[in-house]
A protein has these predicted regions:
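Proteolytic maturation boundary segments
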Residues: 20-48, 235-309, 314-323, 327, ...
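Bacterial Sec-dependent N-terminal signal peptides
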Residues: 1-23
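Short, structured secondary-structure elements
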Residues: 119-123, 160-167
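Feature representing long, continuous alpha-helical segments
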Residues: 308-312, 316, 320, 366, ...
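Non-catalytic, conformational "gating/processing" segments within enzyme and secreted inhibitor domains
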Residues: 162-163, 176, 213-244, 458-460, ...
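Hydrophobic, small-residue-rich alpha-helical packing segments that form membrane-like cores
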Residues: 162-212, 216-225, 229-231, 236-243, ...
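M16 family metallopeptidases and their MPP-like homologs
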Residues: 47-49, 54-71, 77-79, 96-146, ...
Length: 939
């Protein structure tokens, strides 16, 4: 198999003499010196790092270099099953002892206590654990220790978990999942990966002997395959001492079973797969070229980093070209991209992927191949390379700026890849210096040679995925082969570069407004009132050195838009239009080029009762961010040619989504909740037919024609003196009327009374989905918000125990608790879950759901659940207050909704009780509003 990276080595080797010594790519790169890396005598590896963001918190991971690929033919799905069993009892923490303990200190199942299984690895994690006392550290180490070698795997618990995992299979086995499984025999032809099944089959999960699971655990879970990772506000020396002493009894195997690297066979002729599914969301083509992986011993070298820089530049330039094509009105594909990624431990790949309109996968693939052919024949331009270099370095500069502000979780992935794949753990400041040393030596001719070398005639795989629907044509294998020949013989012209040098916004033509008053605001903020009626609330922070977040909101939204215009600003339509439209004289492609080297993310929105702009970026690009906010409000683009591409995307996807049972469930939920209110119409083919650019423009200009009453919140590392002229120029000049903008009561309230909606749909994987909704008119206060969040937390715990653990009837019930203040204050508690479609199981599950919530309303929740909820809410608040996003939301809540979510929060949480929650829920339910919605398989 072609060693793509080795070829790159040879192309670059001649240049290495010119590198400065500090940047010599033949030398190994340095691991972050703050990371303590050790290996015990039994083979266990550990990584420990101190970091105090957030304070008094830590991450604990056990990474096991074992996954589904280690299963034999009798063990399909057992690597994943084992992950579940680790949470069901260990030697030192039997039963639910571990989860109960962690919940008692504020952790929650799913958010802070979780695990994940892949083909190659399994991870167990405890996230954001409060380090309030030494005993918590000791217990978390004990949990990792028991995961590593002392999971009980009790046969009785295994039998109880079978139902949970079978229901997980029902939930996960969507059309996209089935297409993924169907693609494996083509992607991995001739290897074990071709039949590797992450979750198993219903029949296998029902019948496997407990001994098989115990054998898998004993064979593969051993210290030479494992790494313990601990990052947080801890003493590194203390943790290392405790870890080494505790894990000393984890036995190294006397006769270890070797973990083999499984090869993927080469192929001279393209392997071509054509796969379909009735519930597929879209048509796609994946085209990959396999190559050998870089040997482990080469991965720590600077040369490996340099190769990855080359790959990043090639993929970014190619993806910019694909994006430019996709935005054209006659685009041959909806979207396409190139990336480089291993498909196994033994096989790397150059990966092209596209999505197309149904029935047009062949012409889309032919167009993609022509672009690939252009790349190999003509290469890239110097302007393209300069842009991606600038953006790459700007990203690294920002990471270096924010080095001291990284959260604990941000360190973990680099430690995992160091253990599993031998890549170095780079400190961002050091990485920036390395990249600076390499950058001058990356030349266009080398880039273009690499682009040529990565496209080879052998080891190609093409997988076409399509909805299985009457009238949708799919290509044959010989047509795919013919497409390769046509591209190779095509008459082509090199890519032509177009760049505009005009300013994004002509500041000289703008009449600035003025700050007419200044005063102190809440939460250490400052308030500037502008001459056009805009209120600007600024909170300077140092939570992240290179970050600023801005939100602009004015009343109105869809509530004041003519009803016939509402479909044209439906969320999906509006989002795709704004992404493809650009601003002023810049279409989307030109705008992206104009913003080279800038960290400025700005997007307009129109919601039910307000419209505005959300923005984030770097403080050094603050003027650019302000210019974009101004441009989206004053200089939007409504070009018919630019509207065709997003509409083509929507028209291609929506008909397929309508065949998806989960989509149907969401549609029926919205219809039932709001009694078919036309201002809450869920996206559908019928809605798409009502969309027009004329109505979109009419609605948009209506929403943004008057900023009087707009509230703009600015949070982050901002200099007030530097900010003020930008605010006066770009915000003070926005159009306003004499009267502030208002929102209107659109009548979109949750239906009252008792309502049933039971329906059937055709589905490939039979399951029943049940949604129960309680609603009530309640005042939007912080006290009630805390009660709603408490009810959600308590019901989550109750249903994990009753529906999942005791009944084994679902993978999980999702509980949502929402409180809105427009058009009227109204709360909603929503419970949704999937289960076995038999009538008996449905009836039992419904009975449990109702009994749990009614018992809590009658008698109040248990003291245990209340205590766990309070600890979790207080813990989460402590973590959130060091984020700019939290304070941006707090300021918006205060100055737009009149609600202080900060000052009394801790006191309110500490004072909730079994009685107060029970009384709240009782009053909520007794209003008598209940929706029972269910989706069953059509026979």
């Amino acid at each position: 198999m072609k060693k793509f990276a080795i070829i790159v080595f040879s192309l670059l080797f001649a240049c290495t003499i010119g590198f400065a010594q500090m940047a010599n790519p033949n030398d190994p790169l340095k691991n972050d010196p703050a990371v303590r890396i050790g290996k015990m005598d039994n083979g266990l590896t550990y990584y420990i790092r101190h970091n105090a963001k957030p304070e008094k918190r830590a991450e604990f991971y056990l990474f096991t270099n074992v996954g589904a690929i280690q299963e034999n033919e009798r063990q399909a799905g057992l690597a994943h099953f084992l992950e579940h069993m680790a949470l069901n009892g260990t030697k030192n923490l039997p039963g639910k002892t571990m989860i109960n303990y962690l919940e008692s200190i504020g952790c929650s199942f799913g958010q802070n206590i979780n695990a994940g299984t892949g083909v190659e690895q399994t991870s167990y994690m405890l996230n954001n654990v409060p380090m309030l006392r030494e005993g918590i550290l000791d217990t978390c180490l004990l949990i990792m220790h028991d995961y590593a070698a002392f999971v009980i795997n009790d046969p009785a618990e295994i039998d109880k978990e079978r139902g949970v995992i079978i229901e997980e299979l029902r939930t996960r086995r969507t059309g996209q999942w089935r297409l993924f499984e169907a693609s494996l025999p083509y992607l991995y032809k001739g290897s074990k990966y071709a039949t590797c099944n992450l979750i198993g089959t219903i029949e296998g999960l029902q019948a496997f002997p407990a001994q098989e699971l115990q054998d898998f655990y004993k064979t593969w879970y051993r210290p030479d395959h494992q790494a313990v990772i601990i990052v947080g506000d801890i003493d590194v020396d203390q943790v290392e001492s405790k870890l080494v002493a505790l894990f000393a009894d984890v036995p190294a195997p006397a006769t270890p079973s070797p973990k083999k690297i499984i090869p993927i066979p080469e192929n001279d002729d393209p392997i071509i797969g054509i796969i379909t599914d009735p519930e597929a969301n879209s048509t796609s083509v994946d085209f990959l070229i396999k190559s050998e992986m870089i040997p482990f011993e080469m991965r720590p070298l600077g040369m490996m980093y340099l190769i990855n820089m080359y790959k990043a530049f090639v993929s970014n330039m190619m993806n910019d070209r694909f994006e430019e094509i996709a935005q054209k009105p006659d685009a041959p594909f909806i979207g396409a991209y190139l990336y480089f990624s291993p498909i196994s431990k033994s096989c790397d790949a150059t990966y092209f992927s596209l999505s197309s309109k149904d029935g047009e996968s062949l012409p889309a693939f032919e167009s993609l191949l022509l672009e690939v052919e252009k790349m190999t024949r003509f290469g890239f331009t110097q302007a393209e390379l300069d842009r991606v270099k600038t953006n790459y370095m700007r990203r690294l500069e920002r990471a270096a700026e924010n080095t001291a502000d990284r959260k604990n979780a941000e360190f973990v992935s680099d430690m995992i890849t160091h253990f599993s794949d031998k890549y170095p753990i780079l400190d961002p400041v050091y990485e920036l210096e390395v990249a600076k040393g390499y950058l001058p030596f990356i030349q266009l001719d080398q880039i273009n040679q690499i682009a040529q070398q990565m496209i080879t005639p052998e080891n190609r795989v093409v997988v076409v995925s399509s909805p299985e629907r009457e009238g949708v044509s799919i290509p044959a294998a010989d047509q795919i082969n013919e497409a390769f020949k046509k591209a190779a013989e095509a008459q082509l012209e090199a890519y032509a570069e177009e760049v505009s040098n005009e300013p994004l916004v002509d500041a000289s033509s703008i009449k600035a407004g003025k700050v007419v008053s200044e005063k102190d605001g809440v939460f250490d903020s400052k308030i500037w009132a502008l001459s056009n009626g805009v209120k600007v609330v600024i909170k300077p922070t140092n939570y992240k050195k290179d970050e600023v977040i801005i939100s602009a909101s004015v009343d109105g939204g869809t509530s004041v838009v003519p009803v016939e215009c509402v479909p044209s600003i439906e969320n999906n339509v509006f989002s795709l239009w704004s992404q493809n439209s650009g601003v002023g004289n810049f279409n989307a492609t030109a705008l992206k080029k104009k913003l080279t080297g800038k960290i400025a993310n700005v997007s307009p929105y129109i919601s039910s009762y307000s419209s505005g702009v959300n923005a984030s970026g770097s403080p050094q690009d603050l003027e650019t961010i302000m210019q974009l906010i101004y441009a989206y409000i004053v200089m939007p683009r409504f070009e018919a040619s630019e509207f065709e591409a997003p509409m083509a995307q929507i028209k291609a996807v929506v008909p397929n989504l309508e065949k998806n049972p989960n989509f149907t469930l969401q549609r029926e939920l919205m219809k039932t909740l709001f009694n078919n209110n036309p201002r809450r119409e869920f996206i559908s083919s019928a809605l798409v037919e009502k969309v027009s650019l004329v109505n979109l423009e009419k609605a948009y200009r209506s929403c943004f024609s008057n900023v009087n009453g707009m509230t703009v919140t600015i949070v982050g590392n901002v200099d007030m003196a530097a900010l003020k002229p930008f605010v006066e120029l770009y915000l003070g000049s926005l159009p306003s009327a004499k009267q502030p903008a208002k929102w209107a009561d659109d009548g979109a309230l949750i239906q009252k009374g008792k309502i049933n909606n039971h329906f059937k749909v055709v589905m490939e994987t039979p399951k029943t989905s049940i949604v129960n909704i309680y609603s009530a008119g309640i005042e939007n206060t912080l006290q009630n918000q805390v009660f709603m969040n408490s009810v959600k937390s308590i019901l989550d715990m109750a249903y994990v125990k009753s529906l999942r653990e005791d009944e084994g009837g679902t993978y999980g019930a999702s509980v949502q608790a929402e409180l809105d203040n427009r058009p009227l204050s109204q709360g909603m508690i929503l419970i949704v879950f999937d289960t076995d479609p038999t009538p008996e199981k449905q009836a039992k599950m419904r009975q449990i759901v109702e009994a749990d919530i009614m018992n809590i309303a009658k008698d109040g929740p248990s003291e245990e659940y209340v205590s766990k909820t309070k600890e979790n809410m207080l813990k989460n608040r402590q973590e959130n207050v060091i984020n700019n996003n939290f304070w941006n939301n707090a300021l918006k809540s205060y100055y737009i909704d009149g609600l202080d979510i900060v000052t009394s929060y801790d006191d309110i949480v500490k004072n909730i009780s079994t009685k107060s929650i029970g009384d709240f829920l009782k009053d909520f339910i007794k209003q008598g509003n209940f929706i029972d919605l269910s989706m069953n398989p059509q026979e």
